[in-house]
């Protein structure tokens, strides 16, 4: 298996895994604690030696690979809403990587969260609120806001809002890694078959 393509597909799966949780939270107001932790933990791995260092929860990653097959494959599983969120995240990532001040602020704020984890779990409400505020303060202001659709009763709850923003930050982290590994939007069209084949092979590992 082409290692660069494997790593790039892993990062793309990470984006989709976080976005799918945003969609579920917005509709149902609930999240799977293990999946949430898996996505949020990716934010904190800022100097990985490999993509695998970022995605250590293999069960969560497998869900991401399945989403890659659903979104890029020819099946009826394609989800237009997830595609819309993906396009929004990739657009914001382009703006972030062009903003030196934004990247510096992001690094400093993530360091603060790492210090907070000496006392709290990654899924503690205080940590999630902190991650959400990083997204609001740094990412949201970069460009058009991503409009989240869902159940208004769920979306009104502060904890749901915080989790959604924290997961969008996780999606952004994976998008940054995907781009660093050579990912480009045109690959999602012209290299679709190679990405699908890599995701299928990765599901069997």
Curated annotation (Swiss-Prot):
Q: Does the keyword Nucleotide-binding apply?
A: no
Q: Name one Pfam family in it.
A: DUF489
Q: How does it sit in the membrane?
A: Peripheral membrane protein
Which terms in the GO cellular component ontology are assigned?
cytoplasm; plasma membrane
| Compartments where located | Cytoplasm; Cell inner membrane
- Domain of life, source organism: Bacteria
Q: What is its main location?
A: cytoplasm
Does Lipid biosynthesis show up as a keyword for this record?
A: no
Q: Keywords in UniProt for this one?
A: Cell inner membrane, Cell membrane, Cytoplasm, Membrane
Tell me its family: Belongs to the HflD family.
Q: Which PANTHER family match?
A: HIGH FREQUENCY LYSOGENIZATION PROTEIN HFLD
Name under which the protein is recorded? High frequency lysogenization protein HflD homolog
Name the lineage: Bacteria, Pseudomonadati, Pseudomonadota, Gammaproteobacteria, Alteromonadales
Gene assigned in the entry: hflD
């Amino acid at each position: 298996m082409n290692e660069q393509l494997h790593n790039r597909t892993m990062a793309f799966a990470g984006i989709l895994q976080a976005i799918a949780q945003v969609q579920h939270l917005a509709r149902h107001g609930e999240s799977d604690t293990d999946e949430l932790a898996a996505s949020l933990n990716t934010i904190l791995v800022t100097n990985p030696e490999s993509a695998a260092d970022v995605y250590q929860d293999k069960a969560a990653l497998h869900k991401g690979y399945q989403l890659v097959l659903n979104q890029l494959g020819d099946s009826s599983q394609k989800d237009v809403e997830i595609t819309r969120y993906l396009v929004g995240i990739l657009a914001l990532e382009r703006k972030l990587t062009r903003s030196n001040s934004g990247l510096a602020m992001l690094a400093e704020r993530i360091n603060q969260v790492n210090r907070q984890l000496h006392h709290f779990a990654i899924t503690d409400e205080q940590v999630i609120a902190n991650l959400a505020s990083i997204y609001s303060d740094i990412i949201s202001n970069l460009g058009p806001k991503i409009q989240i659709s869902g159940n208004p009763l769920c979306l009104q709850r502060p904890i749901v809002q915080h989790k959604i923003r924290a997961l969008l930050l996780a999606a952004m982290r994976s998008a940054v890694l995907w781009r660093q590994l050579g990912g480009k939007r045109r690959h999602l069209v012209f290299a679709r078959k190679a990405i699908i084949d890599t995701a299928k092979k990765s599901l069997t590992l």
